[in-house]
Amino acid sequence: MNLISIPAFQDNYIWLLADEQKHCVIVDPGESAPVLAALSQGQYLPQAILLTHHHNDHVGGVADLRRHFPEIPVYGPQETANKGATIMVTGGDHLSIGGQNYQVIAVPGHTLEHIAYYSKPYLFCGDTLFSAGCGRLFEGTPAQMYASIQQLAQLPDETLICSAHEYTLANLKFARFILPSDQDIATYQQQIMQLRAKNQPSLPVKLQIERKINVFLRCDDIDLQRKIGVISPPNSLVSVFSELRAQKDRF
């Protein structure tokens, strides 16, 4: 499989996953022009569009893409029904597109009906899990978002996190503020600074790395808890996550 990140807007990524026959799926096309350019350049044949949630920077290109490809199915949660989705899916569904299987995972938090698509090893998680961070809570609760990212954290180490935004450096800056002595975070920050200086994407990233450098996946860390002022037992970490997310919002 060939995974392509298509830059859009200021910091979005639209994902394109293609097989050897050049058949591809398009994930979260916030605008159509860069997608059409990538399809033309690579001579790819789109088989489906996958939507993770209803925000315009993820769905804005659907209508125009459907004008170019009238028969293309557009999968998405119910909240995307009026944003161009033609087939509604929900957590627990399984899709087969061009010989590639996708597991639909419900990940409420950023929005109430947000979903992710997992096709081993690729995880298209929209605005739920970012490299070194997680999405803002526009509709859901901290408990929902924490449960969602914990669910994603159970996937295999080799899972490739395909987030929808290039937020990694900003997230690592916050992570360094929370855990200034953490060597894994410090080292990774330097690596990503070098990548971004060359205008190269920081994504996808292996889940194995995220477990080390993403503070939202480390709510059980006692140093982190002391830093944010919320000490909590391992079986009750939502309060830690909630305060951590609030501090990131203010950072």
UniProtKB/Swiss-Prot annotation:
The gene is gloB. Zn(2+) 1 binds at residues 53, 55, 110, 127. The keyword Hydrolase applies. Pfam families: HAGH_C (PF16123), Lactamase_B (PF00753). Zn(2+) 2 binds at residues 57-58, 127, 165. It comes from the Bacteria. Thiolesterase that catalyzes the hydrolysis of S-D-lactoyl-glutathione to form glutathione and D-lactic acid. Pathway: Secondary metabolite metabolism; methylglyoxal degradation; (R)-lactate from methylglyoxal: step 2/2. Its EC number is 3.1.2.6. InterPro entries: Clx_II_MBL, Glyoxalase_II_hydrolase, HAGH_C, Hydroxyacylglutathione_Hdrlase, Metallo-B-lactamas, RibonucZ/Hydroxyglut_hydro. Coiled coil: none annotated. This is Hydroxyacylglutathione hydrolase. GO terms for biological process: methylglyoxal catabolic process to D-lactate via S-lactoyl-glutathione. Binds 2 Zn(2+) ions per subunit. Its cofactor is Zn(2+). One of its GO terms (molecular function) is metal ion binding. Gene3D superfamilies: Ribonuclease Z/Hydroxyacylglutathione hydrolase-like. It catalyses: an S-(2-hydroxyacyl)glutathione + H2O = a 2-hydroxy carboxylate + glutathione + H(+). SMART domains: Lactamase_B. Belongs to the metallo-beta-lactamase superfamily. Glyoxalase II family. Monomer. Keywords: Hydrolase, Metal-binding, Zinc. It is an enzyme of class 3 (hydrolase).
